[in-house]
Amino acid sequence: MKIVIAGAGEMGSHLAKMLSGNGHDITVIDSDPKLLADVASLADVLTVEGDSTTFAVLRKASVRKCDLFIAVNHVENDNVVAAVLAKQLGAKKSIARIDNNEYLEPNNKEIFINMAIDYLFYPEKVAAQEVINLLGHTSTTEYVDFSSGRLSLVVFRLDPTSSLIGRELSGFKDDAAQLSYRTVAIARGGQTIIARQDEIFMEGDMVYVIARQDAVKEVMEFSGHSNVEINNMMILGGSRIGIRIATELQDEVNIKLIDYNAEKAYRLAELLDKTLIINEDGRHIEAMLEEGLANMDAFIAVTGRSETNILAAMLAKRMGVKKVIAEIENLDYINLAESIGIDTIINKKLVTASNIFRFTMSTDVQAIKCLTGSEAEVLEFIVKPNAPATKAPIKELKLPQDTIIGGVVRGDKVFIAVGNMELSAYDRVVVFAMPASISKIGYFFN
């Protein structure tokens, strides 16, 4: 697939690296030659220097021949203009990053569809929603619903108190004849291990389980964690993510939002009438303690600065806060943050990748989730009539290495996949796979 990316900043360079690694032909546009040099050193891409909102530059990047145009410039208006022009010049699909939730309202969204933009995505909104979902499942590190919640990926770290430590994976399964959950992978020491039945659970393992909705509670009992009711919450950072979280939850939870910028704090106080806004520097330990950090049920660090978020999250964990979530945009810091006990990490690059990746698939992909604690991805496919996957039991399909089918939704029935199961047309199938296998999976469901 030929893909043109407008914007060589952090998000654009991450997408270029990820997509070129999956065998796509990538061209990156940016007006900053240094950013272009940086992205060219990270990935096998072509670069075009110039303004992506001009016809000349878009023509130079051959957008008329591209299958997908992705606008991720820093300026929202530039993304909208570039996406419209690219589609008019011949791009098959055109998508744009936005920073304004107003654009996603149904009436306004229709306008952009009429302008020929295929998809608008707002990473901060998706990241905020992930945080809100996790606050309802505080014992998990990541929690992803598929097929309207009928199947879920449940991720948890094994604490010393977990009864799973020292047991084989084969021993962690539902005893019923029809399984209701199964382990699909373990992340350990920065590596992801696709589930093998003789693998031994170890303390600190990140465990990935596909579960039916009615089995999630049972799965979590094995983790050594328990869900905590969130009544008091502190948000560090009046960023777009922080504002959206407070807006959604301020009627249900007592929220303190801390921001070091006095002018912004005044604006936030007008915007969030049921949230207590505090003008303070979250890096000052004494100030955080005075504001009652130790009494919080949840702490969310979303300042936009990874280092500040990590330090503040470490303090919150030390003070005994039950659920600690930190936004970490530097991908190199993620393993470090997990190793020091931060419960959950959110990353806008991975959120964006999850939104965009499905546009590069030839198969009917309903959802993709790029995981934070693992290089693996989880995908939901719809099986087409006469697809190869319908011709033999799962164990005989010769799926790509490091790929495992976790669950299947068939009409109103939900199954955990086993080797002798045969897939049918229109099944919704949840697949856990490593990046090198992603491009090969679609064949089985087409």
Language model: regions and residue ranges:
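Cytosolic regulatory regions of ion transport systems
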Residues: 1-446
